[in-house]
């Protein structure tokens, strides 16, 4: 527990917090002791109500967040009047409430109340910490929560961030073994907004090896500026399929990094010195693992507004600024293209490997994505379901000069609402195609009624592997209940949809009939379903073979 809480305390200090107002209590012992041990300016207020307003006064005068610390139970409630005032007078406070661990809640344990979102909308931000664990990943995690709390107390109007902290006994920290540096990044986290984000010292990119990550962003208007930035920095641009940078064949655009980053040796060889990240979290889990592997790298996230997207717990600079304006503001011109050349080498090798899918005769998702890309009219919308469909697009959708827009629901990454969302996209009047697996399709079958009732035009390419084949790629595949709980074969006959929803239905049996059906579907009105049956076992074998560098 000691170093977990020590990392929390240190991160707040690194962010610029200097004052802690502490209300005495037992459950908050590790927090109180370690704030004192670190050297914060500590004030003790016996009455929590008074302590809350005292902290409010400090924050008003200092114009920076002040920490409030209390024990569990009714102590939490006594801060409420000050928190109400902080909300309405826009004063930054970070409230740390100690709590009983889960096993002592709802069982009559003393000084235990429901502290989850206790301050309701009076707090701008709430999060409950995980129980303390003494390991590196958890130290980085707790630091990340403090960053979110700190920025939330300042961003878009000052206010209150509330962090609830469950703690188990023993509660006294080990002051002899405490390490306040646990989980620190090599570059302390910094948050800049507006003009400050555009006046940063861009010499940090001079003669450095770096990459640009472009995650999904349906509203992106910065493609040209970011490509020009990549050219100036000689930085490979890792283009998530939903970022829509793959509408260009620029040699710096990487479109199959998820495959070659499977290799640990390649991940080590391609270590960057900086990362610039635009847009959402990428689809590629291997890319997230790559950034997590290189914690000592200067990692910038650039966004129009603050939304902490950092599953790899690696970000060291958050710039709230227009991506377009930021890209223009970096005037550095690097000359050495050796680093980007190594990325291009693996990109070319992997793309040749993935394109071997064209030689396959059996129906396979990878080749179907390639055929689909060849067949989409200019200006098309390709809506891609989650689970395996988006991963197949990530692998097999090649960067080339074309004009299509790829969309998906990567906010919560669920499979629900897939058909309905695609139909909403289809109201644009652009040719619209939904690429989906069978479970995502089944999950939202009733969405087809909207298409029928409103006469919408949508082509649905249904990759039907009879269940949750994505789990074949995960550790659950070894479980003895795999078929029952994860693969969930359904054996459904979707042909009845033709009558039920008055749609056009196809069951292509090979690539020739798929191409014919697809071209015909482009000429027809209404909803058209191409049910392509896939052998899940063969598909897994082909994925494994084609996504290996060797």
UniProtKB/Swiss-Prot annotation:
Q: In which pathway does it act?
A: Quinol/quinone metabolism; 1,4-dihydroxy-2-naphthoate biosynthesis; 1,4-dihydroxy-2-naphthoate from chorismate: step 2/7; Quinol/quinone metabolism; menaquinone biosynthesis
Q: Which cofactor does it need?
A: Mg(2+); Mn(2+); thiamine diphosphate
Q: Which reaction does it catalyse?
A: isochorismate + 2-oxoglutarate + H(+) = 5-enolpyruvoyl-6-hydroxy-2-succinyl-cyclohex-3-ene-1-carboxylate + CO2
Instruction: Quote the EC number.
Output: 2.2.1.9
Q: Name one GO molecular function term.
A: manganese ion binding
Q: Which domain of life is it from?
A: Bacteria
Kindly give the Gene3D superfamilies that the UniProt entry links to this protein. 3.40.50.970, TPP-binding domain (3.40.50.1220)
Q: Which GO terms describe its biological process?
A: menaquinone biosynthetic process
Q: Which UniProt keywords apply?
A: Magnesium, Manganese, Menaquinone biosynthesis, Metal-binding, Thiamine pyrophosphate, Transferase
What does it do?
Catalyzes the thiamine diphosphate-dependent decarboxylation of 2-oxoglutarate and the subsequent addition of the resulting succinic semialdehyde-thiamine pyrophosphate anion to isochorismate to yield 2-succinyl-5-enolpyruvyl-6-hydroxy-3-cyclohexene-1-carboxylate (SEPHCHC).
Q: How is this protein organized at the quaternary level?
A: Homodimer.
Q: Which family does it belong to?
A: Belongs to the TPP enzyme family. MenD subfamily.
What is the recorded name of this protein? Answer: 2-succinyl-5-enolpyruvyl-6-hydroxy-3-cyclohexene-1-carboxylate synthase
Name the gene behind this protein.
Answer: menD
